[in-house]
Amino acid sequence: MAQELGCRMGQVEQMIRYAYWNSKSQGIVVGVSGGVDSALAAAFCCRAIGPEKVLGLSLPASVSNPQDLSDAQELCAMLGMEHRVVLIDPMLAAFKTIPGFVETPYLLGNLMARIRMTVLYYHANRDHRLVCGTSNRSEAMLGYCTKYGDNAADFQPIVHLYKTDVYEMAKEVKIPKAILEKTPSAGLWAGQSDEGEIGLSYAEIDAALKNLEANGWKAGTPSEEKVLSRAQANAHKRLAAPNLLSVP
């Protein structure tokens, strides 16, 4: 079991090295939120190309839990990677001056995710780095992400891993206990949690996804019906934009 896990981790690190070398970039930038997904992605990057080439960016807003920033700082110190903090409230305030601006949790959450993506790519462009994605398979299959926001990246090291697999690997690379034990949250508004918003635990989501994939995407339980409905509604997030471009 340990050998199999080591092989799977080695494959991820090799993919990161390939993306890095092939791009001729000078490093990697990863948004470190204080959550387990970004923690594991950052750890993989440090293991693959060395922590001195990896920049961790925390992009909190006033609604963010202060403990998340503290956990992100601890993670970066443990991994030996550089850490910077950019508060996104001034950018949010600028958007709120747009005539007709409407503020709802849904609209503001998507806006925050896209602002964070823009800041990550600004630093990547400035420092000749790649942006590392932090989406896992469970989120990707459900479409639990912001299009052109937190799903935007130059490579995705953990998108093939179910959330339950993420926890398994995070324990293996010694991610801090505070990160492993916290409630998963996108941090888009105070008190928000992934499982509360979706209405299922990640254990239930992953079990449903595995059963659906094994049974030709035919739901057999209420949980599977809920997961399938969400996956179908958000299929556009997993696909390229429709187009008529033909490349020989």
UniProtKB/Swiss-Prot annotation:
It comes from the Archaea. Belongs to the NAD synthetase family. The keyword Nucleotide-binding applies. It holds the Pfam family NAD_synthase. GO terms for biological process: NAD biosynthetic process. It catalyses: deamido-NAD(+) + NH4(+) + ATP = AMP + diphosphate + NAD(+) + H(+). InterPro entries: NAD/GMP_synthase, NAD_synthase, NH(3)-dep_NAD(+)_synth, Rossmann-like_a/b/a_fold. This is NH(3)-dependent NAD(+) synthetase.
